[in-house]
Amino acid sequence: VTYVAASPRSAGKAYKDAVSSRWLIGANIPEGVADLVVEDANDPSKALGKCKFVFSALEMGKDEIKALEKAYAQEGIPVVSNASANRWTEDVPMLIPEINFAHLDVIAEQKKHNGFENGFVAVKPNCSLQTYMMPLHALIQAGYPVKRMIVTTLQATSGAGYPGVPSFDMIDNIVPFIGGEEEKTEKECLKILGSVVDGKIQNAEYPIVSSTCTRVPVIDGHTACVSLEFDLPEDKKPSLEEIEKIWTSYTSVPQELNLPSAPKQPIVVRHEENRP
C-alpha cells in the first residue's frame, strides 16, 4: 500500500490518526501504512506516480461512485472496485478470475468508449456469490450444464459493515431478509457466466436462480446451501464421486500463472459433518 485517500474530512491526516477511533481489527495498523498521509479522494491526480492501481471501497451514491471511479480511470489509473455501482455497466468486467478471466477483453472497448489511455474500471461481485460460483463453474466446465439453482445464504454480520445489524436483531435470531441481496444473487451469476460479444458482456441464460439470503449471528464467513438441477438426462448426471474429483482437480488461469494471491487449490472439499 503506497497511497490512501478518503473524504476531505480525513485529508491531510496521517492514516493512523484518521482511523484511530475506527480501527477495529485485532492487529496493529501496519507500520508501512500508519504514517501515510491521507489524500482527498476527490482529486485523482494526487494518486499519479504513487500507485499502479487503486482499490475502491466508496460509501457514496451510485452515480457519485461511477463518476469518481471514472475520474481515476481517466487519469490513467486502473480501478478495482468493491462497490456495486459499476457491476451492471456493460463494458465493466465483474470478475472471479478463475471463472471469467476472458471478460478482461472488454477493457479494450471500455477504454475506447471512454477515452481512457491506461486506466480502466473492474469490479468484484457480491460477496456471498464468491462462496459457490467456483464449484458451480467447475461442474459446467466439466460438461455438466446446470438449468436451475436454489440458493440459501447464511451471511455473517460483518458483511453489513460496522456498526452493522443492531444486537437486538441478531442475538438469538436469524434475520431472514437482506435488502437487495437476493436480486444481486439471482442476476450477478448470469453476468459472471456470460460471454464477451462485440466488446460487451452478454449474460448467460442459465442457471435460473431462486435465492433466499439471511443474516446469521456469526462474525466472519458466509455459508451457502446450494441445490442444483442439471440440464441432463438422469443417466448422464455426475455421481458424487465424479463431482468431488471435478472440484478437487479444478484449476484455472490464476493458478497457471502462479499469481501470488491465487490459492493453489481453489476448491477444497471437506468431509467432516461439522464443516460446510
Would you name each region that the model predicts?
Residues 56, 224-232:
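Short, well-ordered beta-strand elements within core beta-sheets of diverse protein domains
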